[in-house]
């Protein structure tokens, strides 16, 4: 994998609210071009700071990096399920429910890297509960799997970008039919 500092395209496919944190975290790997943002604990720390999931004093280890890669893969598989591709994965995290007179909020029990990962799982849970999760999809193109937010009225988008992945998939199918 080629290490890169960020993958800053497809900003038009942003997810609403905190679900965007999940999309940005999951899109730290560009499968098609072999670009990896999370290539070191320092890069993971930078991302988690940018996303506001950890404080400045939090230390990030190689084990945290390995868990980040696993979490990212699981999030992508769950998002593939939103695009009609069967998957058999699950997320697990320790979260606390904070309730006041106006709201109930899931929060991580810890303020470390594990807490940051739990926060992402909590965002997924909340999105599943409010119905927005089904719109966060992973691109169907087998070498992409980029997460995008489906804003189509009938929730029918299957590719992160029709002009790229949709076109390439349709062209390949056309050529296969033509022999």
What are these regions (language model features)?
Residues 1-138, 142-149:
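Short helix-coil boundary/hinge micro-motifs
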Residues 136-141, 157, 162, 168:
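Residues immediately within or flanking Cys/His clusters that coordinate Zn2+
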Residues 150-157:
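Short linker/helix segments within small regulatory modules
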Residues 163-179:
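Basic DNA-binding region of bZIP-type proteins
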